[in-house]
Curated annotation (Swiss-Prot):
GO cellular component: cytosol
Cofactor: how and how many bound: Binds 2 [4Fe-4S] clusters. One cluster is coordinated with 3 cysteines and an exchangeable S-adenosyl-L-methionine.
Function: Catalyzes the methylthiolation of N6-(dimethylallyl)adenosine (i(6)A), leading to the formation of 2-methylthio-N6-(dimethylallyl)adenosine (ms(2)i(6)A) at position 37 in tRNAs that read codons beginning with uridine.
Organism: Lawsonia intracellularis (strain PHE/MN1-00)
Gene Ontology molecular functions: 4 iron, 4 sulfur cluster binding; metal ion binding; N6-isopentenyladenosine methylthiotransferase activity
UniProt protein name: tRNA-2-methylthio-N(6)-dimethylallyladenosine synthase
Keywords noted in UniProt: 4Fe-4S, Cytoplasm, Iron, Iron-sulfur, Metal-binding, S-adenosyl-L-methionine, Transferase, tRNA processing
Localization, UniProt: Cytoplasm
CDD domains, alphabetized: Radical_SAM
Length: 457
């Protein structure tokens, strides 16, 4: 018998994570219960198409689901996200247990669609049409609680836009997320205020290219003339908000007005993720990134002038078609010059339908692997140095969850400092963790995290 319960499997970026969280909250408001994969009647796979062979990953998961749910023949599967947008009704043909395919814009309608599927066993639905404007969603966040897995809901993502108009030559996102569609200022600010009123301390603004907010090609954009710097100014000023971040930005639209806000608002965290992708101007042009290395460094220089303690992270693609050894060495030099606190780096792989998939001068796989290892080793040196430099610093940690390395006689909690570092804080057992933004002193650095002691108990 089909039960009113579900399980969500999520791949990919923070936007997918936020989509899955919203979907979970919405379904629970409708009376569905979130359960384990083995017990679920409805299995939702929120997919990503950015990395290599995404369809194969989804097909593999579907095979495992068939085995895991063999004792529940009435169960069905929902495919959501970017791979759903790409393949659409193909899933119905290959996998009979799939009854809903929901693309990027279809997520807003998915809870009602799942309700229908639960009531109509023979129904199948395809929600892969792009909408003209940002598909607004029902507010589904509940009051701040300490959940069963000892996690505090103190940080929340807020979508401010959908899609992208940049069309970098290697990127599938404009095809799977659609054209850029900014959300209305009023809806964004209202959601942020509702989250703050619910107990949220930190908000992360999300979009494929957040600093292009309001620059939609559609002149009737709901942004109504407001740009990203103006939006950040408004949200950073909201009473009760402790921390504000945004992800992901693009160097091309990084304005002086936005840079100045880092010096104006302590609420705006001293941490920025700004994808560089390559340190070679030649490769940046082939990627269609529309900025030079000098322009990127100029942004960093201005940021450090207004916020000297700012920490920077980035993305790199290694082995892009046409990348020579000299191009790669320029990328290594960019790491040594800017000293990123961390980076996400991957070997280039073709995405069908993108311009770069047709480029000649592909780099050999062995060369790509060797370069990636060299880049990651260089980055590790700077990441280690950054973490060591934090020892002795007094700061605040936003507690998130019980640490996996819980000491036997202590109450060990994990959280993040304003720079986004993972910090494990050892507290006496009797500590009341209601003081969730905790003043601490960093006492040690680990490979990927920090250890701190509380300054106030």
């Amino acid at each position: 018998m089909l039960q009113r319960n579900f399980h969500i499997i999520t791949f990919g970026c923070q936007m997918n994570t936020n989509d899955s969280f919203w979907l979970s909250c919405s379904l629970q408001k409708k009376g569905f219960q979130e359960v384990s994969l083995e017990d679920a009647s409805i299995i939702i796979i929120n997919t990503c198409s950015v990395r290599e062979k995404p369809e194969q990953k989804v097909y593999s998961i579907l095979g495992k689901i068939r085995h895991a749910t063999k004792n529940n023949p009435d169960s069905f599967v929902v495919i959501a996200g970017c791979v759903a947008q790409q393949l659409g009704a193909t899933f119905f043909e290959k996998f009979p247990q799939v009854r809903l395919v929901s693309g990027s814009d279809g997520i807003a309608m998915a809870p009602d669609a799942i309700e229908r599927l639960y009531a109509e066993p023979d129904l199948k639905l395809n929600l892969t049409d792009f909408s003209e404007y940002y598909p607004e969603r029902e507010y589904a966040f509940s009051k701040l609680t300490l959940s069963n897995n000892n996690t505090l809901a103190l940080m929340a993502y807020v979508n401010i836009m959908q899609g992208c108009d940049n069309y970098c030559t290697y990127c599938i996102v404009p095809y799977t997320r659609g054209k850029q569609k900014s959300r209305s200022v009023q809806a964004i600010v209202e959601e942020c205020q509702q989250l703050i009123d619910s107990g949220v301390k930190e908000i992360v603004l999300l979009g494929q290219n957040v600093n292009a907010y309001g620059l939609d090609k559609d002149k009737n954009s709901p942004a109504n003339g407001v740009n990203f710097a103006m939006l950040v100014h408004t949200i950073a000023s909201l009473p009760g908000l402790e921390r504000l971040r945004f992800f992901s930005a693009h160097p091309k639209e990084f304005s002086s007005e936005l840079i100045d806000l880092f010096g104006e608002f302590s609420t705006l965290c001293p941490r920025l993720h700004l994808p560089l992708q390559s340190g070679s101007d030649k490769i940046l042009r082939r990627m269609g990134r529309k900025y030079s290395m000098d322009e990127y460094i100029s942004i960093i220089t201005k940021l450090k002038k207004v916020r000297p303690d700012i920490a920077l992270s980035t993305d790199f693609i290694v082995g892009f078609p046409g990348e020579t050894e000299e191009d790669f060495l320029q990328t290594l030099q960019s790491i040594n010059t800017i000293k990123f606190m961390s980076s996400f780096s991957f070997c280039y792989s073709d995405r069908p339908g993108t311009r770069s998939s047709t480029f000649s001068n592909k780099v050999d796989h062995e060369v790509k692997i060797k370069r990636l290892e060299q880049l990651q080793a260089t980055q590790l040196e700077h990441s280690t140095s950054w973490l060591k430099s934090r020892v002795g610093v007094e700061t605040t940690v936003l507690l998130e969850k019980v640490s996996r390395k819980k000491a036997e006689d202590n109450n060990s909690w994990q959280g993040r400092d304003p720079w986004g570092n993972v910090v494990n804080v050892i507290l006496p057992q009797s500590t009341n963790i209601s003081n969730t933004l905790l003043p601490v002193r960093i006492i040690a650095s680990k490979k990927h995290s920090l250890v701190a002691e509380p300054l106030i108990i």
